[in-house]
C-alpha cells in the first residue's frame, strides 16, 4: 500500500529532460518574480499607514478619537471600524474578480500580457491613493490595486513554473514569494521613516510609492519572453522550440518539446476548461487549488504582516515601536524565505509544510498566552515592560519564519505546478480567487474578531494550523523533482486520490512509491 501522503518520483520510468540552470533563465525568472513586489508592498504599506495618526485623522477620525481617548479601557477594540476595514479589504475582493478574468487572457494571449495588465492597473491605483482627498478615492485606488494584484498573482507563478527546469522549479518559483517578502520589508521601512515627516503627509509617500514596484513589473513584462508552453499553446511551434533550447541551454530538447506539444494538443480538445475542472480525474487538483490557499490564509499570517503595526500598537508598543517591530518581522520574513529557496528542492515540499506547521502552532499558543496574561479578557491598557515586548516579538518572529519557509512560498508553488496544461490557467485562477476571497474575509473580520475574541484570536488560527498540518500529512503528495507536464502521475499512486484517477487518464506510465513518502536519492 502507498505510504501516507508521499508520492516521490523514482529513477525508473520517470522522464529526465536534459537542461541546465542557465544565466538566461535565471535572469528571466528573477525579473518575472518581481511581480510579487506589488503584492508584498501593499501588504506592508497598508497596515503601516493605518497606524499613522495623520492618516487616521484625515480619513478615519472616529478611529483616531477612539485610539486617543483617555477613557478607552479596551486595547483590543480601539481599531474596530467597518470603514477602516473596507479600506484594507476591498483590494482582495477586486483581486478575486480580476484573477478570474486573467485566466482567459493568460491562456489565449500569453502569461506576460496578464503581467503587463497587473503592473499598469497597480500603477493607476497607486497614483489615486497617493493623491487621495476622500475615503472614496482611497477605496477606488485600492480596487485598482486589487485588479493589478489579481492579474499578477494569476500569471507570475505559472510563468515561473513553466520557465524553470524541473530540477530547480521549486527554488525559482519561490522567487515570487521572496519578492513578496521584500516588498513587505521595504514598505515597513518606508512607513517607519515617512511617519516621522513633519506636516503629516508621509502617508501620501507610502501609498504613492507603490508606483515603483508597479513600474518594475510593467517594464519587466514588456521585455520578458513568454514561456515555451504558452507559445506552443498559441501555435508558435518553431519559436517555442528555439526558445526552449535557449531556456534549457542544450540543443537536445526534442523529448521535452514533443511532450509539450502533446500536452498542448490535449488542452485544445478542452473547450470549457472551467467545466472540465469538475471532472472526476481532476478532483485531486481542484481539492488542492481550494484547500491550500484556504489554509494559507487561515494561518493568520496576513493578520501579522498586514496589521503588524496596528497589532503591535494595540498590545502596547506605541506607534514608533510598532512600526519598528513590523520592520523586524519583515526582515525575518525575507531571510526565512531564503531558507525555503535552498531547501524546497532538497528536502521536498511535504517536509517544509509539516515543519512549518508545528513551528507556527507552538508560537501562536505562546503569543496567545503572553497577550492574555498581560491584558486578560477586558483588554485593560497599560505599559508593556521591555522584556515582555521582546518575548512577544521573538515568538512572532519565530512564527513568521515558520510560515516564510513553508506555507508562504509553497502556497503559491504547489498549486502552480500540479495542474495539466488543459486546465492550468483556469485552475490557477481558482487558486488565486480562493486565496483572495479568504484574505478578504480575514481582513474584513480581523479587527472585529480581535475586539471580541481578544487573545483567543491566536488560538483560533492555531486550530486551523493543526488541521492543515494533518491535511498535508495525509493528502498532499510530494511533487519534488517531477517535470511539470508529468505531474499528473503522482495522483495514480496516492493512497486516497488513486480512487479518482485511472490509468487511462495518464497513459504515459506511472511513478513508483518510495517508503514512508521519502524521495529516492537519484532524483
Curated annotation (Swiss-Prot):
Keywords, ordered alphabetically: Membrane, Sugar transport, Symport, Transmembrane, Transmembrane helix, Transport
GO molecular function terms noted in the UniProt entry: monosaccharide transmembrane transporter activity; symporter activity
Record's protein name: Sugar carrier protein C
Major localization class: membrane
Any Pfam family the entry gives: Sugar_tr
Membrane topology: Multi-pass membrane protein
Transmembrane stretches, start-end: 26-46, 86-106, 120-140, 143-163, 172-192, 205-225, 298-320, 327-347, 351-371, 387-407, 433-453, 456-476
One GO CC annotation: membrane
Domain of life where this protein originates: Eukaryota
Cited SUPFAM superfamilies: MFS general substrate transporter
Chain ranges on the Cytoplasmic side, renumbered to this chain: 1-25, 477-523
Subcellular location: Membrane
InterPro entries: MFS_dom (IPR020846), MFS_STP/MST-like_plant (IPR044778), MFS_sugar_transport-like (IPR005828), MFS_trans_sf (IPR036259), STP/PLT_plant (IPR045262), Sugar/inositol_transpt (IPR003663), Sugar_transporter_CS (IPR005829)
Family indicated by similarity: Belongs to the major facilitator superfamily. Sugar transporter (TC 2.A.1.1) family.
